[in-house]
Amino acid sequence: MAKGQSLQDPYLNALRRERIPVSIYLVNGIKLQGQIESFDQFVILLKNTVSQMVYKHAISTVVPARSVSHNNGGTSHTQQAPAVEAVADKAE
């Protein structure tokens, strides 16, 4: 596994395994919502009413709807969802 993905993979896997709803903000400001169905080195499959393949290079932020516990090389981390979202939805 690449050194840069040692945090990313366990975090995304915990979100997938626990079926935690997420908001994914893209670099262009678009907000996508759903559950992570699968992921690899380059893409995330996000499922809502349909499945979407989202390229990781287009993602700015992944925000879980609730706190998530994940294990990174024997060290346990807890990430909590923010109380207030700082990014506004982009009107189309």
From Swiss-Prot:
Its GO CC terms?
Answer: cytosol
Q: Where is the Sm domain positioned along the sequence? A: 9-68
Which UniProt key words apply to this protein? Answer: RNA-binding, Stress response
Q: Polar residues compositional bias: what residue ranges? A: 69-81
**Which portions of the sequence form the region Disordered?**
69-92
For biological process, the GO terms are:
regulation of DNA-templated transcription; regulation of RNA stability; regulation of translation, ncRNA-mediated
Q: Which PROSITE patterns match?
A: SM (PS52002)
Oligomeric state and interaction partners are given as: Homohexamer.
Please describe what this protein does: RNA chaperone that binds small regulatory RNA (sRNAs) and mRNAs to facilitate mRNA translational regulation in response to envelope stress, environmental stress and changes in metabolite concentrations. Also binds with high specificity to tRNAs.
HAMAP family found in the cross-reference section: Hfq
Query: What is this protein called in UniProt?
Result: RNA-binding protein Hfq
Q: Which organism is it from?
A: Actinobacillus pleuropneumoniae serotype 5b (strain L20)
